[in-house]
Amino acid sequence: MTSKMEFTDRAKKALEDAMALAEQYAHSQLLPVHLAVALLDPLPDPSKDQQNAPAGATSSLFRQVIERAHGDPQLFDRALKKALVRLPSQDPPPDHVSMAPSFHTVLRKANELQKTQKDTYIAVDHLITALAEEPSIMNALKEANIPKPKLVTDAIQAIRGTKRVDSRNADTEEEHENLAKFTIDMTAMAREGKIDPVIGREEEIRRVIRILSRRTKNNPVLIGEPGVGKTTVVEGLAQRIVNADVPDNLANCKLLSLDVGALVAGSKYRGEFEERMKGVLKEISESKEMIILFIDEIHLLMGAGASGEGGMDAANLLKPMLARGQLHCIGATTLAEYRKYIEKDAAFERRFQQVIVKEPSVSETISILRGLKEKYEVHHGVTISDAAIVAAANLAARYLTSRRLPDSAIDLIDEAAAAVRVARESQPEIIDSLERKLRQLKIEIHALSREKDEASKARLEQAKKDAENVEEELRPLREKYEQEKQRAKALQEARMKLESLRQKAEEASRMGDHSRAADLQYYAIPEQEAVIKRLEKEKAAADAALNAAAAETGGAMITDVVGPDQINEIVARWTGIPVTRLKTSEKEKLLHMEKHLSKIVVGQKEAVQSVSNAIRLQRSGLSNPNQPPSFLFCGPSGTGKTLLTKALAEFLFDDPKAMIRFDMSEYQERHSLSRMIGAPPGYVGHDSGGQLTEALRRKPFSILLFDEVEKAAKEVLTVLLQLMDDGRITDGQGRVVDARNCIVVMTSNLGAEYLSRPNAKDGKIDPTTRELVMNALRNYFLPEFLNRISSIVIFNRLTRREIRKIVELRIAEIQKRLQDNDRNVKIEVSEEAKDKLGALGYSPAYGARPLQRVLEKEVLNRLAVLILRGSIRDGEVARVVVQDGKITVLPNHPEVNDEDDEMMLDEEDAVDEVAPESEMDEDLYDD
């Protein structure tokens, strides 16, 4: 029967509560008395946030009816409970609770009432009217001094008035129930001190107040980049309303933030979302006090709740009220989303007045951070130094360019404070290691106590002594740690108390309780401030004493000060850019950088020097912050141009592959530029981003290697102009990518033909050759491209002596390769063999690459065969010597198969015969 009836949400809940009550009392039938109890004392609604429920929420409708009919609700409640207890219960409880005929009668009467009153749904008042005519309920009403059911009907009529039940939530008992459910009261939050102080933004707040004071179209929309403080402007307005710092027309208004997610969530049926939205708007328009509705991310309303089958969306429901000025609405959205969603709907857009929220400058950000400092200090229980605030604002502006101030700077402060707090609340390393040691000794003592032999007894005595020593060492450390922790905790609690007192003083002055406000302002607050100063002084004195006696006590164990170093650490962790202060070990490493790089790149002193100087400038902070160091490495093939870049990557990042490499031979066509910076709008792959721009966005501190740069199309190289000059590059979507912290390295073979000229004996480039190479570069590259390069380095040709040094490096590489592949074979190369390899691998035109081929042919091929054959086994030494003028790898074990030997000999002869013919022409660049 109930399946044909349509109930409001509250009536449906009352029926469910009545059924739950019958099950609780183990009654076999559902009776009207169950429904009466459920309506008189409804259970709390779990769908609503009980904490945010309005203070002094009204009593149930049934109670209001009893009171209006001049009855006693308590007597009525007692009579109902008495009747409920008298009902027979079953043990064990019944599996199914059925409806009694009297309950069916009540529902039928409620249904008839609904039809008579032309309501769409059966509401709570229909159920109460039907119950009042039921004999058992009539008896209870008589006990509550209500002799006739008509008194109940009249009371309901007086409360309900002429309202129609045309929606599922039309019979709400609480005033503004929809507002309580779907909005957050920002003025109440400001009153309770739950909103952070708003510093600055006066101009934007004044403009919002001016727009709200208009007669029509009084709806501002705050537009700005993410993180500039759009919501903060509204929070500032809420604080001004609470402090009565607004014009009279806004003096007693409420600022409510609409929760669009809660509004849409759970709206299963068609029309349910619209019903909720209409309920919210109706309550706003019927409210006695002025309500300003704040919708964060207002673009969510465009299409929110639309079913796709002609259903209304939220924006269309708002339009009529916005145009007439009945609804004061503040929106907030980003520039991109405003353009994408709101500008498309001109009718919706014209109802809002734009307020552009600009990004604050670094100095304004510092002021904002100083204002927020106390909140973060109280929350984390740390002290934030002013130097940390200045560092956070400056570093956020310089290194976190993809994000906006003040949001990025606030995040830095917050995370640095959290890091200090976590470090403080974790056990110091020294205590942790001693406790682990003590646990191990206790386990050892427990195990040895069962043993009977003399050695175990002696070991047991020793273990007990060790445990006592560790405990003695640990006791003072624990005491010291607890004392330091206690001091920090006491200070945090004192600060929290001060915050609470200030809040109470503000509340008292707002409420006009001047005596209490004066008492707090001139007695309690100064007293608490004095306590904090005393605690700070005691803590500073204790820390100073510990640091003075650092040799004996080891200094203070915990720190609770956030300084610039902590901020630097967070920036370095986020971006990978080394902005932390140079440690002594790192200083040493940078000072001896040439020595380290020269071990890998042989014979290129000038190139190594120029790269080292650029890195030192960058790390010491003396380089131009807007211009990344850029190099053009020229020289013959195989002289170490790319190798130097790999060595630099290994030096900086401990990984030779930690660089962004572009092989410019892949960028020979003009259109391949879109691969580097991303396809322009309208082209396929517009959203995917470019290889260069995306890599730089992810790793701002990296080495960019443009290999064989002269092979690329001229249009591709022009993109690098602004990258080398201003450290910025714009991708296909118009976003500026920061490239100020990278190192640009380009390699080129231009002018290599001039480098084959006979030079000085040490392989150095003479001035004439240098000029010829520079002319070749000038003839090929644009003047503005060459003019932006920090340093053009011409690599020297490798001499025989340098090739001989490279032999040592290559053999060390082979040894490492064997270890990486779990081959425990040690290679020993005689000095004579090394000289021979150096002589065979020397090629003025091809640099060090022929040496690799010689090593492969003369050593590696033969070594591979011997290892596979078992002539050289794991743990043995492979000796490379010169025999009869040839390089030979000596086997450690005699060969097993003669046929294989003959075959190998034939192969070696064949290799020797072919080798002279396959030798490369070393005079490739000769005219």
From Swiss-Prot:
Stretches the record annotates as Repeat 1: 7-87
Function: Required, in concert with Hsp40 and Hsp70 and small Hsps, for the dissociation, resolubilization and refolding of aggregates of damaged proteins after heat or other environmental stresses. Extracts proteins from aggregates by unfolding and threading them in an ATP-dependent process through the axial channel of the protein hexamer, after which they can be refolded by components of the Hsp70/Hsp40 chaperone system.
Binding site for ATP 2: 635-642
Location relative to the cell: Cytoplasm; Nucleus
Disulfide pattern: none
Keywords: ATP-binding, Chaperone, Coiled coil, Cytoplasm, Nucleotide-binding, Nucleus, Repeat, Stress response
Region named Repeat 2: 99-162
Domain of life assignment: Eukaryota
Family, per entry: Belongs to the ClpA/ClpB family.
UniProt cross-references to InterPro entries, sorted A to Z: AAA+_ATPase, ATPase_AAA_core, Clp_ATPase_C, Clp_N_dom_sf, Clp_R_dom, ClpA/B, ClpA/B_CS1, ClpA/B_CS2
Name of the protein this chain belongs to: Heat shock protein hsp98
One GO BP: chaperone cofactor-dependent protein refolding
Coiled coil: 429-553
GO molecular function: ATP binding; ATP hydrolysis activity; misfolded protein binding; protein-folding chaperone binding; unfolded protein binding
Any one GO cellular component localisation term in the record: protein aggregate center
SUBUNIT field: Homohexamer, forming a ring with a central pore.
Keyword Zinc listed: no
Region (NBD1): 179-428
Free-text note regarding domains: Has 2 AAA ATPase type nucleotide-binding domains (NBDs) per monomer. ATP binding to NBD1 triggers binding of polypeptides and stimulates ATP hydrolysis at NBD2. Nucleotide binding to NBD2 is crucial for oligomerization.
